From Swiss-Prot:
Record's subunit section: The complex is composed of two ATP-binding proteins (YehX), two transmembrane proteins (YehW and YehY) and a solute-binding protein (YehZ).
Recorded name of the encoding gene: yehX
Protein name: Glycine betaine uptake system ATP-binding protein YehX
Family: Belongs to the ABC transporter superfamily.
GO CC, alphabetical: ATP-binding cassette (ABC) transporter complex, substrate-binding subunit-containing; membrane
Function (record text): Part of an ABC transporter complex involved in low-affinity glycine betaine uptake. Probably responsible for energy coupling to the transport system.
Length: 308
């Protein structure tokens, strides 16, 4: 879907990206992570030509991106950023409709798409005519993601999209993005500096340093088979057990024949999130519900200790 072949980028005399070779598979959720100044945001911005590469080739769906008109390329890619960038004097509906209007969609088609995306992102219909300043930070970011998805792009690019949000809202939106990716099957490339966010979201994880890829692969491989000491130290030896819990879901450890009382865990939660709730509630067993909110079993604290 998106292929970097020997790509480099300089800002003045400084090489921000050096001889980069990467392949983002169609339908994958890829996450770029690394040290400050590692080149991860530059790499993302080269995909939709917000930053032009100096050498090498970047191919999108088999075509070198420089052979495509910039507007055509960007209309095939949604883009969501930390600052959100909503138009302050436009309503939620108008913001979501930005790209479909540019593409001359019919009014009826646009209205249907707004309704569809607001439902998908968990935005209540009564927010449709509100303005950005009337929304919470989490709601604003959901509108930003809805706008990025509005024209049904082939690729969704996300640059630190949840960085300014509080931890609770951030966690909820991470869970939403996992669900949306599962439902839509879109190719997503996301940049973050947050290790836990990267581990929670990524199918394909790319660790960068000084403009180069240090290691890439699935998160489990990165944690358990680090390529060198830099990778090992970046992910943290002392936190390895807890971070491994981030890669497992409650659904994989549910005892489905059992039932219990109390506030339930969602089966799509990570074991790391479940561990926090066990500690907060001081109990040994918690009930579990499925995505429809129906009881589906229990999770035992002891099972988490075995996994960690």
């Amino acid at each position: 879907m998106i292929e970097f072949s020997h790509v480099s980028k300089l800002f003045g005399a400084q090489k921000a990206v050096n001889d980069l070779n990467l392949n983002f598979q169609e339908g994958s959720f890829s996450v770029l992570i690394g040290t400050s100044g590692s080149g991860k945001s530059t790499t993302l911005k080269m995909i939709n030509r917000l930053v032009e590469h100096d050498s090498g080739e970047i191919r999108f769906a088999g075509e070198e991106i420089r052979s495509l008109p910039v507007l055509e390329l960007r209309r095939r890619m949604g883009y969501a950023i930390q600052s959100i960038g909503l138009f302050p004097h436009w309503s939620v509906a108008q913001n979501i409709a930005t790209v479909p209007q540019l593409q001359k969609w019919s009014r009826a088609r646009i209205d249907d798409r707004i309704d569809e995306l607001m439902a998908l992102l968990g935005l209540e219909s009564n927010l449709r005519e509100r303005y950005p300043h009337q929304l919470s930070g989490g709601q604003q970011q959901r509108v930003g993601v809805a706008r990025a998805l509005a024209a049904d792009p082939q690729v969704l690019l996300m640059d630190e999209p949840f960085g300014a949000l509080d931890p609770v809202t951030r966690g909820a939106l991470q869970q939403e993005m996992t669900r949306i990716h599962r439902l839509l099957g879109r190719t997503i490339v996301l940049v973050t500096h947050d290790i836990d966010e990267a581990l929670r979201l990524a199918e394909h994880l790319v660790l960068m340093d000084h403009g180069e890829v240090v290691q890439q692969g699935n998160p489990l491989t990165m944690l358990t088979r680090p390529a060198n000491d830099f990778v090992r130290q970046f992910f943290g030896r002392s936190e390895l057990g807890v971070r491994l819990l981030s890669l497992r879901s409650v659904a994989d450890y549910v005892r489905r024949e059992e039932r219990a009382d109390g506030e339930a865990l969602a089966e799509e939660m990570t074991l790391r999130d479940a561990l926090s709730l066990f500690v907060a509630r001081g109990c040994e067993v918690l009930p579990v519900v499925n995505m429809q909110g129906q009881p589906c079993g229990t999770l035992h604290f002891q099972d988490l200790l075995v996994e960690a």
